């Protein structure tokens, strides 16, 4: 095993708090269509300060993908409070993972790989959210068989070792995932989703408690209300797909990798995405079709970045 590698011992499970928080963000993440397993007893890796949102040397081109404006509902939840709460919860998650032997080794090759990719994407983040200039970005690689990744508000990113090991991703494909997760934070999907749950009467008490926002309501969710929320979530996922595609292209990563990524994801998930109207995320074929149709729109950005 190389320095900073992973010990493969008996299984260990994170506390209910840790699993719940990761589960909450997984439900907002495009990767949760894929089957996953519990945390194994193994050492993970930590990468702190993945890079800063530096100003580009040249004036960036206008956005090439069409996703419209961010939801005005997000204004019901103060961005500063949500980002501060996320930073606090993120630190707790890292401490919990470390206590379970699932964290930290800056010298690992996979961690350095994520560092390189993040440094190429982060400078383009402010185009989608000016607050990103102030964020203290972090990227962590955590020992888990889960095929997943997420980005909390404020730029707190986590990758699971399972997604890198099981899918054998290229750098371009990793960039598509990272761009997608960054897009969730930049487009403030969590902020808007929490606000919408309050407005529609859907209770997200788990998210509220974990993010330190207090009670958002006392009405139990029913099937009808939940279906309304699912529609909103599917829109978020499509939005993040396209913004992430553009972020990765601007960073010099081949946009065609978004298609190959989802082909791998469909295979890993057994090809079962469920009925579209009940899914919290677009099905594999739907995603691939939409991404493929948008690849030409960002091809020029990719070529410019590579020149």
Residue ranges with predicted function:
Residues 5-7, 13-307:
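A Zn2+-metalloprotease active-site environment signal
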């Amino acid at each position: 095993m190389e320095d900073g590698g992973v010990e493969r011992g008996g299984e260990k499970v994170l506390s209910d708090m840790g699993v719940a928080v990761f589960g909450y963000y997984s439900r907002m993440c495009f990767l949760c269509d894929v089957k996953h397993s519990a945390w194994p007893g193994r050492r993970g890796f930590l990468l702190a300060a993945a890079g800063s949102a530096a100003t580009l040397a040249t004036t960036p081109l206008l956005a090439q993908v069409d996703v419209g404006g961010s939801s005005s509902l997000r204004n019901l939840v103060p961005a500063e409070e949500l980002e501060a709460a996320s930073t606090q919860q993120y630190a707790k998650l890292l401490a919990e993972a470390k206590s379970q032997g699932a964290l930290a080794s800056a010298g690992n090759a996979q961690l350095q790989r994520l560092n390189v990719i993040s440094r190429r994407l982060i400078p383009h983040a402010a185009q989608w959210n000016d607050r990103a200039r102030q964020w203290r970005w972090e990227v962590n690689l955590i020992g888990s068989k889960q095929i997943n990744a997420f980005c909390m508000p404020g730029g707190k990113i986590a990758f699971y070792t399972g997604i890198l090991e099981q899918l054998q991703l290229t750098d371009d494909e990793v960039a598509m995932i990272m761009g997608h997760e960054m897009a969730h934070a930049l487009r403030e999907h969590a902020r808007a989703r929490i606000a919408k749950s309050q407005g529609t009467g859907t209770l997200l008490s788990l998210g509220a408690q974990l993010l330190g926002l207090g009670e958002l309501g006392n009405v139990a969710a029913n099937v009808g209300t939940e279906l309304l929320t699912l529609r909103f979530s599917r829109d978020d996922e499509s939005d993040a797909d396209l913004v992430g595609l553009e972020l990765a292209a601007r960073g010099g990563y081949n946009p065609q990798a978004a298609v190959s990524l989802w082909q791998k994801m469909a295979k890993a998930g057994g090809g079962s995405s469920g009925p579209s109207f009940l899914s919290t995320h677009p099905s594999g074929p739907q995603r691939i079709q939409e991404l493929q149709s948008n690849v030409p729109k960002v091809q020029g950005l990719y070529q410019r970045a590579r020149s």
